[in-house]
Amino acid sequence: MEDFLHRIGAMARDADGKLRPTAAGLLMFGHEYEIVREFPHYFLDYQEHDRSSTEDERWTDRIVSSSGDWSGNICDFYFRVYNRIAQDIKVPFKLNGADRIDDTPLHKALREALANALIHADYYDRRGLVIQKWPDKIRIANPGAFRINVQEALVGGVSDPRNESLIKMFNLINVGERAGSGLPSIRSVWQKQGWQVPEIVEAFNPDRTTLTLPLSAAKMAVKSGGKKVAALLNIAKRTFYST
């Protein structure tokens, strides 16, 4: 097992030749109380809100890395949070032979978005990683800014990952696309769903990247001319139903 962890970058030999956990290995497989010794500001937070909640109101359910009742590492956090998010995603009935296909491009895009945040977060930064889920959107905010231009990230093909060893580890569990393809893939899936375009916002000092994933169709913009048309349609409907 140590040899395997060494090969994937979770362990490395020290000056005495002994295998020790790397920073990436600690984040992926360690316990929270061990992780915070290396990353004092390390904190993972998942919050669920119901439809009636405003963004300032209290969550209805929560998972945090510091609770002490689970490991608190990013691997376990990934699976706990993904399973919570995925349970609300509708799966169309499709068969592969006699087997039902329960994994859709939307599921894959959600895994990509979650893994991207965990992989590219700056865990030395003083603000933790926060994921918030409402029935109509998911917001993922991680410490650290893009290491490339945002427009380049949206186009794809260019990548400057902060934690390359974490990419390798997530790839071993079939999570994460090839370098530089994550955001374009997510946007493509959202477009095919007919949903509003995902929004990316960068903030600085402290650096923070926030990805908002709408889970609903784009709203039609009504211009001044459109309002007149809508009014005429309403009059026509009332006239139709009164006759």
Language model features with spans:
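Active-site helix-to-loop segments that bind/position phosphate- or nucleotide-bearing substrates
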Residues: 1-127, 133-138, 146-159, 173, ...
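Flexible, glycine-/charge-rich segments associated with ATP-binding catalytic modules
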Residues: 35-37, 42, 149-231
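Residues in the recognition helix of alpha-helical DNA-binding motifs
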Residues: 242-243
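Conserved DxG motif in ATP/Mg2+-binding regions
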Residues: 138-143, 213
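Short coil turns linking two alpha-helices in DNA-binding domains
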Residues: 236-239
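Short amphipathic alpha-helical elements of helix-turn-helix/winged-helix folds
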Residues: 84, 231-232
